[in-house]
From Swiss-Prot:
HAMAP family: Ferrochelatase. It is an enzyme of class 4 (lyase). GO terms for cellular component: cytoplasm. PANTHER family: FERROCHELATASE, FERROCHELATASE, MITOCHONDRIAL. This is Ferrochelatase. Fe cation binds at residues 197, 278. One of its GO terms (molecular function) is metal ion binding. Catalyzes the ferrous insertion into protoporphyrin IX. It catalyses: heme b + 2 H(+) = protoporphyrin IX + Fe(2+). Its main location: cytoplasm.
Length: 324
């Protein structure tokens, strides 16, 4: 049988609409995942259904309304652009393979992504989760979702999972180019904050390499940019619940920087392959307000790599390595 390879780009997902009902459905699926919240179900499920979802859904819906575009969710719009750009760039390289998009939560699901590839005759799949740094709560959830999608298959396709690319030279260079381009257009701030999505500290103690990989990414980026240790900080955002998460916390760090004399701050979020609620609202709105209220004078958010040419070229490099 002839082997036909297909690519499945995977990201976390997004609500279908910026409404309370749509956000509630999305959060329910997301927060039911035991890779994300591993508390005992008998404790977590009542808390989730009777307290968290009813109170959090309308609040989060209002946040989504601030960043929603005419085309839809920023994450979905950008992800579709990435898919199309990747397929086109592969074609330019002489690699004629179909590329489909899937989300761990929401639509298109991993099963829907697989069915689209299967309809094109694909029997070998390269899974590319758009998480540069591996974590049990992200990359491992993609693996789980893929396994679930395979449950009804009689003839399983060959699958290759690109586990992470946190130190890939082309990824680091793409980030560096993005930072330099921003500095050329807006001037260089006095400090560069690299904010990564956080995870509970307990996950790291139990073996999750995410924190180490984030710190490695940050150090490599700082090295390429030629920054001294005093010119940059790696921090962690988006903590949820009462557990201790990886530190330093982004909001606490940002609040304290003006008192150290840093009035002009640049922020980049290297763990996000596409701009989304956590970058466009949490960083660009909430954390900007925190910085300015603490005495800051200039806050510059450096956008995610999104469908930047260097980002797409990096994806091609990752995929071609698996095709070899």
């Amino acid at each position: 049988m002839t082997t036909k390879t297909g690519i499945l780009l995977v990201n976390l997902g997004t609500p279908a609409a910026p409404t309370t009902a749509a956000v509630k459905a999305f959060l329910s699926q997301f927060l039911h995942d035991q890779r994300v919240v591993d508390l005992p179900r008998y404790l977590w499920c009542p808390l989730l259904h009777f307290i968290i979802l009813p109170t959090r859904s309308p609040k989060v819906a209002k946040l989504y309304q601030q960043v929603w575009t005419e085309q839809g969710s920023p994450l979905m719009v950008i992800s579709k652009q990435q898919r199309a750009a990747l397929e086109q760039e592969l074609k330019r390289e002489g690699v004629e393979v179909p590329v489909e998009l899937a989300m761990t939560y929401g639509s298109p699901s991993l099963d829907e992504g697989w069915q689209a590839l299967k309809a094109k005759g694909v029997n070998r799949v390269i899974l590319l989760p758009l998480y540069p740094q591996y974590s049990v709560s992200t990359t491992a959830s993609v693996f789980d979702g893929w396994a679930k999608a395979m449950k009804k298959e009689r003839n399983l396709p060959v699958v290759r999972l690109i586990r992470d690319y946190h130190a890939h030279p082309e990824y680091i260079q793409a980030l560096a180019m993005s930072v330099r381009r921003h500095w050329e257009q807006h001037g260089q701030g006095e400090h560069l904050l690299m904010s990564f999505h956080g995870i509970p500290e307990r996950y790291e103690r139990e073996g999750d390499p995410y924190g180490h990989q984030c710190r490695r990414t940050a150090a490599l980026l700082a090295e390429v940019l030629g920054l001294e240790a005093s010119q940059w900080t790696a921090s962690f955002q988006s903590r949820f619940g009462k557990e201790e998460w990886l530190k330093p916390y982004t909001d606490v760090t940002i609040a304290g920087l003006p008192a150290t004399g840093i009035k002009r701050l640049d922020v980049i979020c290297p763990a996000f392959a596409a701009d989304c609620l956590e970058t466009l609202e949490e960083i660009q709105v909430q954390n900007r307000e925190i910085f300015m209220a603490a005495g800051g004078e200039q806050f510059e958010y450096i956008p995610a790599l999104n469908s930047d040419q260097a980002h797409i070229r990096m994806m091609v490099s990752l995929i071609c390595r698996e095709l070899a």
